[in-house]
């Protein structure tokens, strides 16, 4: 736990968290106190209230991977998968220090990219709200906070950001995917990106870009909050710094030819990874970029999850 001096220092800078916390080097902090500054932006509905889920919430206010970490998280893929494209998921490339979970991208000897990967030991179920305060990396890899079902069929991307990009590096890219695994096919999906002021910036299905991003922050330059309210099997609301930016439901983008939708629990995932479509286009991090600690790390200050009860 940080001392009183650290707490005072953090309190002074935390006032800007709603608009993003800028700064070259994240410092120690009192995140367990800090997230309480931010009311859950979503209403729990009915006569329910929000109850914190300690099993899926962490202030990362410790060092290394003690039982505090290991009781909640796995630092490798649950099935031992190495990851997509040139990813090589690695437990050695995530750690906790200075009040942050740090997830790193670094060159592997075989030419692939070591990618830190952390997932919750147990899944969560709706109705819930989950949110991270994070700073994306500056790499050509994606910086992510997402949810995935145990059978790898249902996926919700709260944020998937390519921090190196001048425009897309300003987007909170949200998405859903519904897969069939055998034989593999993608049954349904929809991706949309949003700027920090809440404006619509990108349609991933058509490739359309809306606005030039002038005056919008590059997400690699500061901490921002990214959250999702999983309301039901067919309803999700996405929040950027506490602002509602997207409603996903059957009246707009949500489809499922199976008519099951998101009817099963999902695990939380915090990671970085390589994507095949970018590899195919030659968009890959260089050795120098992967060795540069000023851009090759994602910093997660905290993750909090609440159940509506």
UniProtKB/Swiss-Prot annotation:
Residues 33-309 form the GH16 domain. Residues 1-30 form the signal peptide. It is found in: Secreted. It is an enzyme of class 3 (hydrolase). Belongs to the glycosyl hydrolase 16 family. It catalyses: Hydrolysis of (1->4)-beta-D-galactosidic linkages in agarose, giving the tetramer as the predominant product. Its EC number is 3.2.1.81. Gene3D superfamilies: 2.60.120.200. Pfam families: Glyco_hydro_16 (PF00722). This is Extracellular agarase.
